[in-house]
Amino acid sequence: MDLTPREKDKLLIFTAALLAERRRARGLKLNHPEAVALITAAILEGARDGQSVAQLMSAGQQVLTRADVMDGVAEMIPDIQVEATFPDGTKLVTVHQPIA
């Protein structure tokens, strides 16, 4: 399998997000990398599904709450920027205060 660097990045994000989902399902609070991976994966998948940038900016704030993450993690992530591929090209999606 010959993957581009971008495809490798997406695969790494997916793997980290899958691990985060499993840990969250077991009742564990997520750390910084897990939280970022889960939100990023949700944005990438939403773009693939055809959602708009505005929809993804809003949806990115609904993925996790403070109760889902370890103490201090929400403050460590003031915003997340994801370069996602949409049907009409690649766009930058910025989610401000992603963990409410």
Swiss-Prot record:
Write out the GO biological process terms. Answer: urea catabolic process
Keyword terms, alphabetized = Cytoplasm, Hydrolase
This protein's superkingdom?
A: Bacteria
- Name a single GO cellular component: cytoplasm
Listed under catalytic activity are: urea + 2 H2O + H(+) = hydrogencarbonate + 2 NH4(+)
Main site of residence?
A: cytoplasm
What's the gene?
ureA
Q: Which GO terms describe its molecular function?
A: nickel cation binding; urease activity
Q: What is this protein called?
A: Urease subunit gamma
Q: Does the keyword Ribonucleoprotein apply?
A: no
Subcellular location(s) per record: Cytoplasm
In what pathway does it function? Nitrogen metabolism; urea degradation; CO(2) and NH(3) from urea (urease route): step 1/1
The species is: Methylibium petroleiphilum (strain ATCC BAA-1232 / LMG 22953 / PM1)
Quaternary structure (record):
Heterotrimer of UreA (gamma), UreB (beta) and UreC (alpha) subunits. Three heterotrimers associate to form the active enzyme.
What EC number(s) does the entry state?
3.5.1.5
The answer on whether this UniProt entry bears the keyword Hydrolase reads: yes
The entry assigns this protein to a family as follows: Belongs to the urease gamma subunit family.
